[in-house]
């Protein structure tokens, strides 16, 4: 069965595979822009905006926890945490692996700490439960079953009562196939980036949103998307409805 998505305005969107998404990222970073820092900032701000929207009037006094991996997905989550801290929310974070942090993600971590974000061990009973957890552990670069600290954090997250928003792809879900080779996050909401992927099955993502990274239309066309039409005419965040045909 083929997975299709539709926007609130009725635009039909055919999902893409991970290799196509990698090519879109490559073209943007190496040739056209926006660069990696800019796309990470756009991803984080979109995630922060969606978080504030979902919190609504309950945002005052809310606590957010960011679970961040070492790469671009983790950087987007940490960036979102900084924006939320700037808007008055209490923001904590934990890292899947501090030693492997990429340069751009490390920069986002420094900015979050400057905004008041604090590192915690969420598994510790002393930490307490967050209102919302931002899952930014793995993203579309999953290779096999999550292991080590990432697997531990996923198990802990699924056992709790916090509302979960996954960034791009629920951690542990194969973005191409929708297969789950091991532990995987079970979010209420997923914000996927740039374009939906073929593995974003509705039973795995919860409510699905699409976030604009600011990539020029010509990049999508060069990557092989025929008759490209931007879904972001109405805004930076687009609600998607899935159907399997």
Curated annotation (Swiss-Prot):
Write the record's keywords in alphabetical order, separated by commas: Isomerase, Metal-binding, NAD, NADP, Nucleotide-binding, Potassium
Broad enzyme group? isomerase
Pfam families (UniProt xref): YjeF_N (PF03853)
MF terms from GO for this chain are: metal ion binding; mRNA binding; NAD(P)HX epimerase activity; nucleotide binding
Q: How is the cofactor bound?
A: Binds 1 potassium ion per subunit.
- Per its Swiss-Prot or TrEMBL entry, what cofactor is needed? K(+)
Tell me, what does this protein do in biology? Catalyzes the epimerization of the S- and R-forms of NAD(P)HX, a damaged form of NAD(P)H that is a result of enzymatic or heat-dependent hydration. This is a prerequisite for the S-specific NAD(P)H-hydrate dehydratase to allow the repair of both epimers of NAD(P)HX.
Q: What is this protein called?
A: NAD(P)H-hydrate epimerase
Which organism encodes this protein? Dehalogenimonas lykanthroporepellens (strain ATCC BAA-1523 / JCM 15061 / BL-DC-9)
Q: What is the lineage of its organism?
A: Bacteria, Bacillati, Chloroflexota, Dehalococcoidia, Dehalococcoidales
């Amino acid at each position: 069965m083929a997975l299709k998505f539709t926007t609130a305005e009725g635009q039909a969107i055919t999902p893409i595979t991970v290799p196509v998404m990698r090519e879109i990222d490559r073209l943007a970073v190496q040739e056209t822009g926006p660069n990696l820092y800019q796309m990470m900032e756009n991803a984080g701000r979109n995630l922060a905006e969606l978080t504030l929207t979902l919190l609504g009037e309950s945002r005052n006094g809310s606590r957010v926890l960011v679970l961040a991996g070492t790469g671009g997905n983790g950087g987007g989550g940490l960036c979102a945490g900084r924006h939320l801290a700037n808007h008055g929310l209490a923001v904590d974070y934990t890292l899947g692996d501090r030693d492997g942090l990429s340069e751009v993600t490390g920069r986002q971590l420094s900015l979050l700490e400057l905004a008041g974000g604090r590192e915690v061990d969420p598994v510790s009973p002393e930490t307490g439960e967050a209102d919302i957890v931002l899952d930014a552990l793995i993203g579309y670069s999953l290779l096999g079953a999550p292991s080590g600290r990432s697997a531990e954090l996923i198990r802990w997250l699924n056992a709790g009562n916090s509302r979960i928003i996954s960034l791009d792809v629920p951690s542990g879900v194969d973005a191409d196939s929708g297969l789950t080779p091991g532990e995987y996050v079970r979010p209420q909401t997923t914000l996927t980036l740039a374009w939906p992927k073929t593995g974003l099955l509705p039973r795995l993502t919860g409510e699905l949103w699409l976030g604009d990274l600011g990539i020029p239309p010509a990049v999508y066309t060069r990557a092989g998307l025929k008759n490209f039409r931007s879904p972001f005419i109405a805004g930076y965040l687009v609600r998607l409805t899935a159907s399997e045909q």
